[in-house]
């Protein structure tokens, strides 16, 4: 093609030269427009001022909307309340080191104050201990420097991580901490296992809580489910560090490891737990759901043929609400029973005031007129049967021993 036959170069849109010069045209040679492809025609139309088509507008609009949809969608997902909460958490974390310094300063100031009072009491001829107790009264809580481990295992099943919200997961973490504390400081305690410890719950303990759980003594965390944890617990209880048959088990010295059983505790069970047995494993559901998933623990156990039972709250306590307890309350009640062997007293020392728990009148009369050892036998005869649901009509489920776990796991895998 010769120089004079070539079309003029099309100038870019928006340039000042394009507006000052004469209108530009394409196809200086006849028939050139017909020879061009549709794509080239479209491109050439976009390059001509005022020649933009509807298709070009449609292609530009989604691009602009895509660029603006991202931030709007993000803002819709995060509410103002969540933003404020996140800001508070960031502020709390930022001042962590500052709080440590303040605590150390307060501790040092308190020690210095006690030392000054001690010296002052000695100069005045007074008893320093009495003077210090007046200003710094000792706590009345009983502390046991050394606990006695019993051949009994408590497993907290945390396999409900996907069913909980973030705030419920935070609450469960607090309940696990309190459960460990109650079991650890008790005069008689059992083996404590946290099963299905994974996903977001584990992430919270390792990040927000700075792995403080790794320093807990007498507790084991495992990613396995509660059924596998129960099998391993049976082997541990038979070992040299399995525990001693003392305290509440001192009259069961003839108990054998094969007599132990596995029980999943749930308020939906028709069977009531009467006592804790040596070499047995009790599973507690680690779920905080505000009763959204009712009966899920009971269903989980019955599908595998595991025995279920509920604490005897209805026999001793008059409740103002549904007898569903937090995980740490269940652990505390069982630990207190190991010390007292008295369900009524264990409930009264553990239940929070908001539950409105009070001893039933029939139980009060029993405790006043009947020796502590005979309370259980009188209860079975029907002394308090009028105020509790009839559980004798339901035949207790056959106990599952640790030997049966392999068969249960095989059936679970086959399904």
From Swiss-Prot:
Residues 1-84, 354-415 are annotated as: Disordered. The keyword Methyltransferase applies. The active site is at residue 289. CDD domains: SPOUT_Trm10-like. GO terms for biological process: tRNA N1-guanine methylation. It catalyses: guanosine(9) in tRNA + S-adenosyl-L-methionine = N(1)-methylguanosine(9) in tRNA + S-adenosyl-L-homocysteine + H(+). Residues 361-379, 401-415 have a biased composition (Basic and acidic residues). Its EC number is 2.1.1.221. Keywords: Cytoplasm, Methyltransferase, Nucleus, S-adenosyl-L-methionine, Transferase, tRNA processing. Residues 140-358 form the SAM-dependent MTase TRM10-type domain. Residues 34-46, 62-73 have a biased composition (Polar residues). InterPro entries: MT_TRM10-typ, MT_TRM10-typ_sf, tRNA_m1G_MeTrfase_euk, tRNA_MeTrfase_TRMD/TRM10. GO terms for cellular component: cytoplasm; nucleus. One of its GO terms (molecular function) is tRNA (guanosine(9)-N1)-methyltransferase activity. It is found in: Cytoplasm; Nucleus. S-adenosyl-L-methionine-dependent guanine N(1)-methyltransferase that catalyzes the formation of N(1)-methylguanine at position 9 (m1G9) in cytoplasmic tRNA. Monomer. PANTHER family: TRNA (GUANINE-9-) METHYLTRANSFERASE, TRNA METHYLTRANSFERASE 10 HOMOLOG A. This is tRNA (guanine(9)-N1)-methyltransferase. It comes from Emericella nidulans (strain FGSC A4 / ATCC 38163 / CBS 112.46 / NRRL 194 / M139) (Aspergillus nidulans). The gene is trm10.
């Amino acid at each position: 093609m010769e120089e004079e036959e070539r079309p003029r170069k099309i100038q870019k849109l928006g340039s000042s030269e394009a507006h000052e010069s004469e209108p530009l045209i394409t196809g200086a040679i006849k028939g050139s427009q017909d020879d061009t492809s549709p794509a080239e025609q479209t491109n050439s139309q976009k390059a001509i001022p005022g020649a933009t088509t509807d298709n070009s507008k449609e292609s530009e609009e989604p691009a602009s909307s895509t660029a603006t949809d991202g931030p709007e969608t993000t803002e819709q997902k995060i509410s103002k309340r969540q933003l404020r909460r996140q800001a508070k958490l960031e502020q709390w974390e930022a001042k962590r080191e500052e709080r440590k310094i303040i605590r150390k300063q307060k501790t040092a100031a308190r020690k210095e104050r006690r030392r000054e009072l001690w010296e002052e009491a000695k100069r005045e001829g007074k008893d320093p201990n009495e003077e210090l107790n007046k200003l710094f009264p000792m706590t009345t809580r009983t502390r046991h420097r050394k606990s006695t481990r019993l051949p009994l295992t408590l497993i907290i099943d945390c396999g409900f991580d996907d069913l909980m919200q973030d705030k419920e997961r935070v609450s469960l973490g607090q309940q696990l901490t309190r459960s460990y504390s109650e079991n650890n400081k008790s005069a008689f305690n059992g083996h404590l296992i946290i099963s299905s410890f994974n996903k977001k719950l584990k992430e919270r303990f390792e990040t927000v809580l700075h792995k403080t759980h790794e320093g807990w003594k007498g507790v084991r965390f495992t990613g396995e489910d509660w059924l596998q944890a129960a099998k391993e617990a049976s082997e541990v209880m038979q070992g040299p560090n399995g525990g001693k048959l003392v305290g509440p088990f001192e009259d069961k010295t003839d108990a054998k490891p094969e007599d132990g059983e596995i029980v999943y505790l749930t308020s939906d069970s028709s069977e009531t737990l009467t006592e804790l047995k040596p070499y047995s494993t009790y599973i507690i559901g680690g779920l905080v759901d505000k009763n959204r998933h009712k009966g899920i623990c009971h269903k989980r156990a019955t599908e595998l043929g595991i025995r279920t039972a509920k604490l005897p709250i209805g026999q001793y306590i008059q409740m103002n609400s549904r007898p569903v307890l937090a995980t740490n309350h269940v652990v505390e009640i069982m630990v207190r029973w190991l010390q007292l062997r008295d369900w009524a007293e264990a409930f009264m020392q553990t239940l929070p005031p908001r539950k409105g728990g009070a001893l039933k009148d029939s139980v009060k009369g029993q405790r006043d007129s009947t020796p502590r050892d005979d309370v259980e036998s009188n209860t079975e005869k029907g002394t308090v049967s009028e105020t509790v649901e009839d559980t004798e009509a339901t035949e207790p489920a056959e106990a599952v021993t640790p030997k049966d776990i392999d068969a249960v796991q095989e059936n679970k895998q086959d399904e």
